[in-house]
Structure formats: structure tokens, C-alpha cells
Amino acid sequence: MVGGEGLSNGYKYRLQQPLQTAPGKFDENIAVGLDYLLAEMDKRQMKAVLHFTNTWEWSGGLSQYLEWNGYPATPFPKDPSFDWNKFQQYVAQFFTCEPCKEQVDTYIRYVLARTNTITKKPYVQDPAIMAWEIMNEPRPMTLAATPAFETWMRHTAALIKSLDKNHLLTTGSEGDAASDRKIDVFERVHSDPNIDYLTIHIWPKNWGWFRDTATVKGMPVVIGKARTYVDNHVVVAQQLGKPLVIEEFGLPRDGQVFTPDASTKLRDEYFAAMFGMMKAHPIIVGYNFWAFGGTARPIPGQVFWKKGDAYMGDPGGEEQGLNSVFDADKSTWAVVGKYLKTMK
């Protein structure tokens, strides 16, 4: 992501150092951090895909814009009284909040007007950036909000392309899981000529495809459902004549044990199956597994992130180590390496 929005408002698991501290107010130190990241990626011939905001509360996201414009406090997921339907209804208000949408436009203009302080390259000309995404996992959240959601997506895509004609643009979509399995919403959003390629995310655990990854007999169901999900969205990509990227997919370690010494046999099997789908569907042009955990490690006896902990691939409100692939996960890296060889 480009950066978070808003300072802490009582939700302790959110990003602690946002780029946008208040509407139209930006922390230059954080912006320089992004400059540094892009400069280092460029040295290594790596490419960034950057999204501007988030459906979810852990980076501020749409909820933060609502709070900035006088809406009640966000109903946070870790609150004992949390209600998923109320959260959806809350976030859906963003798409009819005119000042909220204007503030996102201001944020986008700020980012796309920036010149990297290290490389001196304007962001709109930076080869380290492969693509922009409108947001992470855009969802209308309610059926009633769908028309306003689609209108906002088209508006935002047009704004980004008007400011940057050099980079690719995509949505950041999960696929039809974002719209109660109404794949026509996914198709309409990606039919926009300003959108260059399609994205999907696949989350077997979050979507209730299994109860325990230690149960080997459950893996055929997981892999079968993943294949069906991919196949359904491949059809849309083929109809639109645009490439498809599977840009988020992950699985916990065996038995949902989060420590690095726990087996990743089932995760490795899942990754191999996902990578293998490209052979059957050449319109799939890339993958991004979730997520790189690096040298960070879960802290014994602690489930969620606390201030001062090392960052890994899992957002602070998720179990630390849940989907992270650590630097020492040799078998998983072997699967990834085998796939990379087929791409060369």
C-alpha cells in the first residue's frame, strides 16, 4: 500500500504511522520511507503494485474517511460487540459521502504528483512501480450500495489514468467473493477501459472452506474450490480480453500452528496447485502469495501484534504467523522457486 490513513483512534491493531495523518495532511517522513523502498526495489529490479486505500480498518481505510467527516466511530472487529452486518452497513456509507470521496481524490493527487527524493524520478515515471490499485479489496459491502460503488470505482480509475498514463491500473478486487458471489459486479468493474488487468484473491480459511488444515482429507475440497473460483474468473478475463493476476492467496501452517517449526506440507501442496493453474489458463499472468514474513517471528504466548513488535506479513489484528512465509521456510521457497523457473 502507499500508506495508512489516520492516527490511532482506539483500535490498537491498526498501522501506527500513517502517511495521511488528517485530511490533506501528509507525514513527509513516511513518504520518504516509500521513496526509499522504491529506490531499493529499483536496484534489485523488483516491481511494486501500490494501492491507495483499503476496505479494511487496519490501515485506516474507508472507515477513517467516514470518521473524519463526522460519522460515528468505526465498529472494530476486535470489539466484543462487533457485528459484521453493522460493519458492512457502516463502510458502505463511504460511497455516498461526497467529502470522503473528495479526500481520497486529494490523496491520489498528492501521491501521483510526488517526485522520489532519492532517485529524483517522478512517481508517474518510476520504473519500480508496475501498477497502481484503486484500493485493497474493494467491496460495495451492501447490495444497495452497489451502484454508488461502481460509479466511484469508475471515477477513481479515470482520475488515476488522467494523472498517470505510464503505469498499469487495476482494482485490487477479491473477485465475486466481494459482492456476495455476484460475478456481474466483478465483470462490470473490470470492463472499464481504464482498468488494464483483473485481480482475484483466494482465502480458504476466511471463506470457511475448511475447519482444520491438519486434516489432510480436507485439502482436496480446498484445492477443488480454489480451482473452481479461478475458472469462473478466468471466463470473465477471457470475455474482457484482459489478463488476470491471482494477487493474494495463502494458507495457515499445518494444524494452524503459527510457529516456524510447524509443518507447511499442506500449504506447499496448496501453493503448487495454485501455481499449476497458469498452465491450464495462459490468461493468468502472475501470482502474489500472501505473505512474506521475512525474519520476523511470532512471540511465544502472544497471539496478536503489539507496538514494538517486528512486522510480518499478517496485519496486527490477525494471528501473527497466520499466513506468513518466513525466510527459513525452505520447502515453501522450493515450491516458489520451481514455479519461477517456468516463468523464465
Where would I find each of the regions flagged by the language model?
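Active-site mouth of glycoside hydrolases
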Residues: M1-W209, M219-P243, F249-V336, M343
